[in-house]
Structure formats: structure tokens, C-alpha cells
Amino acid sequence: ASRLVANVCLYGKHSNSRRYQRFRSYRSYFFRAVQAANAPIEIVAVNDLGNIKTMAHLLKYDSVLGILPNDIKPVDDGISIDGKVLKVLQHRDPKDLPWASLGVDVVIESTGFFTDRDKAAAHLEAGAPIVIVSAPSAGADATFVYGVNHQDFDRSKHKVVSNASCTTNCFVPMVKVLDDAFGVEKGLMTTIHAYTGDQQLVDGPHSDLRRARGAAINITPTGTGAARATSLVLEAMKGKLDGTSLRVPVPTGSITDFVAVLKS
């Protein structure tokens, strides 16, 4: 089994509390996905500055995904899951994390603070062989969408890789199927997307006035780079696609609509 670190370096006192909550959820989703797939992955540690008791509670109880059947409780140095302790680290700087001594194979960088290649590479300095950024990553060695180009992964040269965005993972397989069968000349994507942690739950200040409106009671138009980012996965699509996003008042469940001009 691979020894994997789910690195979720959350900043409990950071001013961007919306982002803090958003990425705490991602850690729970990753843990649940590993369990559901019965994957041969050992999650060695989580890096989080938050309260361990609260973290254990949020892992056990999820408002969207429900309650995990596992016996989950906080302990002195981590979270006990069915009697096995998941170590909780609390470092602000990724360079200080003990990845080498823990013998990890992969670090999942899902904080949203270290998405750029230069910042995510701090995990390499700390001893991690490979870093997977769970978001678009500027300067990443490669961007992969499973089922489209994951077979191009090369461990010898891909040290910091991006898994792109959720919208890109939904959108790109559709584009590939159409392009392989008919050829895509150009296209426009619209994603009808569940609201996210980067919106206000009720009306409040935001740098984007549209996202300042209450997420649960508004349809919010916003931008998305998912269409343009497609060329990072399918190079032939460079300059051919664009898109927009509508955030709708549901906590989970999103769809992507794609209109294309085909070659045949």
C-alpha cells in the first residue's frame, strides 16, 4: 500500500475563513473516497492548525455526505479511526513538515494557499517525492484528468502535478469523446455549480459583488477558467473553448453543459 499524506494545512485564524471551511471539507471527502474504493492507500498524517476535537467531529459527521460508520474520536496526537491513530501535524510552513521521516510517497496539497508550483514545491523540500495539488496549479509540472491523460504521468519528471478543478474533471472527458469522434472546432461551456465556500452564506462583503450575495438564495453568475484550462490536458483545444459558471442554491450536485461546433 502507498503511504499517502493528506496534507490539509488549514489556517484556523486566517482572515479568509470561507476558504478555511472549504478545504476542511475536501479532507473529509478524500478520506471517504479512499474508504469507499477500498484503495490500498495508507493515510499517514494530516496537517491542520485547527482544534483536533472539532476536526474529529467534522470527519465523523458531514452535513452533505452523512455520518461515517467508523469509530472516530480525538486523541492526544491525532484522530483515532477504528483504533488506528491518524497523526495530526500542526505546521504553518510546509517546509517544516516531517515528510521524510514519515516515509510518505505522496502529499495531497488541498489547502488552496499553496497551489502555485513554487509554493507547493515546499513539500518536496520537506522530503515528499510527489505533490498532488487538488486544484488548478500555475506552473505545475503537468495537469491530469483521470481517464483522459493520466497515462502520461511520468514519476521521473512530474513532481508537482495538478488534478485540475472539479469542473475541468467533469468537462474534459466530454470534450475528448467529441473531439476523438468528430473533431471540435470551438465550443462554449456553462457549468451550473453548487455554491462553494468562496461565497457568502448571507449577504456580506466580498471582492466580487456577485458573490457577496447570499449563496443559498441566489443564482450567482461568475467566471470559470475550466474551459481555457482544458488545453493543459488536451493541447489541441488551446484557444478553442470558453465558458461561464452559474452558482446555484444547492449545497452539492453540479452539471456542465457544452455546445460545440464540430468538424464532421
Which positions does each model-derived feature cover?
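C-terminal substrate-binding/catalytic lobe of Rossmann-fold NAD(P)-dependent dehydrogenases
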Residues: A181, K186-T190, Q199-S264
